[in-house]
């Protein structure tokens, strides 16, 4: 199963840091690609620097029409929309995992930066809430991806990494490849 993240909306200066965190969280927790609906050179370059240093094959893409992208994806994949107004993650997560496992389909995860159009709710196979209190989309994304993968991606190591951290009880264990 491949996981892609579709970030709806991005408000330039206001969102560049949080959008970067959305991309880095996506990469760190198992997604293969993040798709933005707005061009942002700063976010793209930040993500590319991380991938260059920490490895992997994470992709950054910009699409003109999120609707077209999501509709095409849904033809052969499963679309989950993270929203405060969706079904309780504790009640629906097993069903989502089983659906993916049974169908062997890829997953598109929609998260918003601003008010999400009604069409996203209608298009999604699942509208899922991670709690019913206001919090960050980064938190919702991290919790969902961790639950989806059952913690298996937390300590992933990536091919071609120039920097690697090894968990340790008492010291920093960092490997840095010299050029």
Swiss-Prot record:
<protein>
    <recommendedName>
        <fullName>tRNA (cytidine(56)-2'-O)-methyltransferase</fullName>
        <ecNumber>2.1.1.206</ecNumber>
    </recommendedName>
</protein>
<comment type="subunit">
    <text>Homodimer.</text>
</comment>
<dbReference type="InterPro" id="IPR029028">
    <property type="entry name" value="Alpha/beta_knot_MTases"/>
</dbReference>
<keyword id="KW-0819">tRNA processing</keyword>
<keyword id="KW-0489">Methyltransferase</keyword>
<keyword id="KW-0963">Cytoplasm</keyword>
<dbReference type="GO" id="GO:0106059">
    <property type="term" value="F:tRNA (cytidine(56)-2'-O)-methyltransferase activity"/>
</dbReference>
<feature type="binding site">
    <location>
        <begin position="130"/>
        <end position="137"/>
    </location>
    <ligand>
        <name>S-adenosyl-L-methionine</name>
    </ligand>
</feature>
<keyword id="KW-0808">Transferase</keyword>
<comment type="function">
    <text>Specifically catalyzes the AdoMet-dependent 2'-O-ribose methylation of cytidine at position 56 in tRNAs.</text>
</comment>
<keyword id="KW-0949">S-adenosyl-L-methionine</keyword>
<dbReference type="GO" id="GO:0002128">
    <property type="term" value="P:tRNA nucleoside ribose methylation"/>
</dbReference>
<feature type="binding site">
    <location>
        <begin position="112"/>
        <end position="116"/>
    </location>
    <ligand>
        <name>S-adenosyl-L-methionine</name>
    </ligand>
</feature>
<comment type="similarity">
    <text>Belongs to the aTrm56 family.</text>
</comment>
<feature type="binding site">
    <location>
        <position position="82"/>
    </location>
    <ligand>
        <name>S-adenosyl-L-methionine</name>
    </ligand>
</feature>
<dbReference type="GO" id="GO:0005737">
    <property type="term" value="C:cytoplasm"/>
</dbReference>
<dbReference type="InterPro" id="IPR029026">
    <property type="entry name" value="tRNA_m1G_MTases_N"/>
</dbReference>
<dbReference type="InterPro" id="IPR002845">
    <property type="entry name" value="tRNA_mtfrase_aTrm56"/>
</dbReference>
<dbReference type="Pfam" id="PF01994">
    <property type="entry name" value="Trm56"/>
</dbReference>
